[in-house]
Each structure stands twice: as C-alpha cells, then as structure tokens.
C-alpha cells in the first residue's frame, strides 16, 4: 500500500512516525533521522522539527528496520521517527504538551512552510548514533535498567550490554 501511494504521488513525500516514550528521557522530545547514503536534513525539515517543539535530532549511522527507515530508503520520503514525550496512563496525558506538533502538522497539511524558529525552540541539538544495541539471542544481557532515562551520559568503562561472545563498553570518552 505504501509503495502504491508513493507511485501515485510522485511529488515530495513526508513521513512523520509519531510516538510517545515509555522510558523517561533527559530530552523530552526528539527525532530520529533514518540513514540514507549522501542525504542531509533539509533546512525546512529542521524548521518543522523546531516548530513541533522537537529540539533534539539523532542521525542514524546505517539503515534500520523502522517504518521511517523503510519510507526514506525505499519511497524516498523525508522521514522521521518522533518521540513526543513520556506517555502517561489513559486520561492523564496533558494534550497541551502536543500543541507544537499539532500546529506544525496543520501548517504542513495546508502546504505552508514553518515560520522562522523562535525562542525557546530556535536551536536543534544534533547527535550521531555511534553504536546500536541489538539483542543477540538467549544469552544477551542489557545492563541498563528500564528506569534509566534516554540521553543519560555513561562514563568510560561502563558495560552497556554483553553476550557470551562480546560486549559493548563505553570507550575513553563519555557517551
């Protein structure tokens, strides 16, 4: 269905895969930009993220298995996976916290560009993924508790994960 849609709509495609996080985060809202060889984030997409009150962007270092990776690599869409804050129990979510993404999407649907970034959402902090964690099987051990926030800095020597054959330990600089 996605391929048919892309073929029927040859103009620019945009895909924003919106999520709320289960894990806490030191950066409440962030986006992941799927890796596509030679591609950079267009200025209008950076402006869109800031209008949506997303101030943190992670650049993935290789193709992934997410829906946004599929749509960017195979359908040539400008795609992001966007984490919009921590989910609360049903009925306890403050919908006002989603006004940024709501306004940005409404403007996009009308075909209007994002306004020039304004404080406090006028700077996008960009990180590059350097290592990904993949569950390698039955003897995989992940050493980060579920209640540790995303974007926590780990000191050199910290073991992040291991299995019977290998492990990932933070190198000489904090990560």
Predicted regions and their residues:
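Structured catalytic-domain cores with a bias toward divalent-metal coordination
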Residues: 1-175
């Amino acid at each position: 269905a996605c391929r048919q849609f892309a073929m029927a709509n040859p103009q620019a495609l945009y895909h924003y895969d919106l999520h709320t996080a289960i894990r806490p985060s030191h950066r409440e809202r962030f986006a992941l930009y799927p890796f596509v060889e030679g591609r950079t984030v267009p200025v209008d997409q950076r402006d869109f993220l800031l209008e949506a009150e997303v101030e943190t962007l992670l650049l993935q270092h290789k193709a992934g298995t997410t829906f946004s990776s599929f749509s960017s690599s195979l359908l040539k869409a400008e795609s992001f996976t966007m984490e919009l804050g921590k989910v609360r129990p049903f009925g306890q979510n403050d919908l006002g916290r989603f006004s940024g993404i709501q306004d940005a999407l409404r403007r996009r649907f009308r075909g209007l560009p994002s306004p020039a970034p304004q404080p406090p959402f006028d700077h996008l902090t960009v990180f590059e993924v350097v290592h990904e964690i993949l569950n390698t099987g039955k003897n995989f051990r992940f050493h980060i508790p579920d209640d540790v926030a995303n974007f926590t800095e780990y000191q050199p020597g910290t073991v992040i994960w291991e299995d019977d054959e290998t492990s990932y330990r933070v190198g000489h600089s904090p990560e």
